[in-house]
Amino acid sequence: MNDISMMGYPGMGQQQPQPQQAQQPQQQPISMQPHTMMNMMNTNLPPPGMMMGGAGSNTGNENMINHGLMSGNPVSGIPNNNSHQLLDQLINKNPNNMGIPQQQQDSLAAQMQLPMGGMPMGNGSAHNGNVGMNNNNTGGNNNIPMGNANVLRNNNIIGNLGGSSLAGGNMNSGMPGISTFGNTPGQLAAPPIQPNANANNPMYHPHLEDPSLMNNPIWKLQLQLATVSAQSVGQPNIYARQNAMKKYLATQVPPQNQTQQQAQAQSQIAETSKSLVDCTKQALMDIMAPDDSKLKGMSAPNTASTTTNSTISTPTTSKIDMNNSREQPSTPSLLLQHKKLSQYSIDEDDEVENRMVAPKDTKYNDQIWHAIDLSNLQIFNISPNLMKYDFLTRLYLNGNGLESIPSSIRNLKNLRVLDLSHNKLKELPKEIGNCYQLKYLYFFDNQITTLPWELGNLCNIQFLGCEGNPLDKELLKILTEKSFTGLIFYLRDNRPEVPYPHDRKFIEINADGEPEKEYDTVQEAERNLSSDMQKKSFTMLSYNTLCQHYATPKMYRYTPSWALSWDYRREKLKEQILNFNTDIICLQEVEAKTFEDFWQPLLEKHGYTGLFHAKTRAKTMQSKDSKKVDGCCAFYKTSKFKMLFKECVDFSGLWMKHKKFQRTEDYLNRAMNKDNVAIVMKLQHIQSGEIMWLVTTHLHWDPKFNDVKTFQVGVLLDHMETLLKEQNPKQDVKKYPLVICGDLNSYLSSSVYELFSTGRVQHHHDGKDRDFGYFSEDNFSHNLALKSSYNCIGELAFTNFTPSFTDVIDYIWFSSQALRVRGLLGEVDSEYVSNFIGFPNDKFPSDHIPLLGRYEFLKSNNTQNSNSGSRKV
């Protein structure tokens, strides 16, 4: 964009060309023209304390938040101090000590003496009207040169740096709970640089005690990135500045006649704009790179070319010297171990970026900025209110005086990058473990001695920066031997047991459908059940057991490896199900072979008999492979029920046999290839003589196919109506005892829930503009009076618990005019759940929890020999 005023800076419109100095070349690349560079720095500099992450934005307009202070707008002709200091850093303090040509430096320095509009710069008093700006002319001396890192560490100037002239006292006005100290209103104190007393302490820098660590590639990476981090100390909002520079450079096209000297200078500026996160990605990409990439002439793309979309992109950059260590005999297994443990590619797009370019249909996607940069602002306290910004993906708190982080950081579950380096932290809050999407966690140069076990939840971690802390030697050993992911897995697998305070309570429901009494266990409730209630009621369980083929270490990285093993989970499932001792057991996600070899023989020993139906894809496979396909199964106690009818159905097959079947485009393209199934049983309750119908199913999982789920339920309910009418044409189908349970993969707000609860789907977005023939024309309507079992006490907090999804998707529906709920298994203890980011774990062997209820038959003549079509309720 040529007009700077269009980028959120109205006082900086296009300027008339300035006369060029005689000694300058007639043509300069745009990135090297002094006036243009000054405009660029003012233009793209985000507001203080904020760095935005709107995708695809290069203007900085739509995704910037202006606090009214330090915005970069010139006030009364006063130039922006941020621009001068940043330009000074870019010219004189480049990281590779490869200076910009002296002629160019002189020209840029001369330009720095002029305001943006070409008017003469006022003296210090002219800044009095520039509210929130610090005109400390000596502040620039507090900045650490972006040069040789050894100078930084050897001269003990890494920690406790003073304020910069860029740090206005009101820099974060409008930000919740930011506490800073300053000498006067509108200014931060600029104390002298204090030496870092721990710079030569081997407890903080173990390579000083054990020089062999210098040959360890993991520790070399720690030192390399700790050096990069140290270079930013004392430079307020360093991430925001670097991001602004990258966005500017991405818009520039080098001229064709660019000299080598000019190209070198431009490359130098691009190098300066690289952040710690960029350097981390560069290093990790090098570790993950193929060995023969150099031979093929391959090199990773330049960072600047891959970071134009947003501040949360994952660019790749050129290789570093660690690639050479791959050839050393002592390092290949270590480097490859990181690759093996990571199980994902460093350069794959962030999930959040994919959401940003997708249709904006959520509150999260309407948010246009996702990062806050509070680096090097002399902040000594962070209010928990900051943690209410749960949409944040990046939070930079490095270079302050923080001694603690609020436990409410657990709310930032979208966080990808967290920089806590160069503070005074003695521990990390265990709640950071809830930020399971963290990829880059930095806490260089603090006072941390150990890591909370909860960090084992950080299953997506790609780098953990810990150098400069007196960290426990055992943890350091694991880090240097097994890399970052190995350390996380160690914390995950060796976490002490979290006590389970109590079993899920069983809630007794009275005849009016209201909770009456709570029992500590299902067994206790059973012991207190009256003999009359036992004769006219039954219990049933519905449980998605998580098929072992889906429970892979890659999918469930947050679960300890021993707790994820099928042997352990199978025994836990067995223990749970047998302890519940229900009259009916319905299971989903059961492998065919597991049913035959484990569940069927086990439950037959305990007085059950059952039926299994695999998903339809098993029909297309050879016998051996078909045994690995999962499906649904239903068991009943032979002492309680007698089976009168059974049927295994698949939804596509039912619809194709329907008398009103239509081959619509949506059916053919969206529903026909889904292989979900259901089991239907007609059972007679032996003690009461009542007849009931039992259905268990597992609907399609993908939320992009909610219309297909509605279609599947519509087919199922239509089929049940047909069966009920065939069995007894004179009886109202509403008065048949019917229970439908399973994993419906549908929210409470879904069209599936609406269809079950109201009998039709009316103008619901899930099925909008979809054509499933007869069902769509009739709004999928049915005449069954169904009610969710948990409706009388309120649906549970969740039935499926994973880091990325926690909600109710499992249900037990019953015919409310023929059955009455008399008891329900309650929710999992919320305090216990707060210690985890998902199931399975050592106590819960599936990512779903079981649903359990007791159901009473209402008085009726609904017996096997009944011909009556009516009864009173």
UniProtKB/Swiss-Prot annotation:
Record field: compositional bias (Low complexity): 14-29, 299-318
Q: Which Gene Ontology cellular component annotation is one that this UniProt entry carries?
A: P-body
Any Gene Ontology biological process: DNA replication checkpoint signaling
Q: Where is this region: Disordered?
A: 1-29, 292-332
Query: Any idea which UniProt keywords this protein has?
Result: Cytoplasm, Exonuclease, Hydrolase, Leucine-rich repeat, Magnesium, Metal-binding, Nuclease, Nucleus, Repeat, RNA-binding, Transcription, Transcription regulation
Residue ranges the record marks as coiled coil: none
Top-level EC class as recorded in UniProt: hydrolase
Q: Which reaction does it catalyse?
A: Exonucleolytic cleavage of poly(A) to 5'-AMP
Identify the stretches annotated as LRR repeats: 391-412, 414-435, 437-459, 460-480
Q: What is its EC number?
A: 3.1.13.4
What name goes with this protein? CCR4-Not complex 3'-5'-exoribonuclease subunit Ccr4
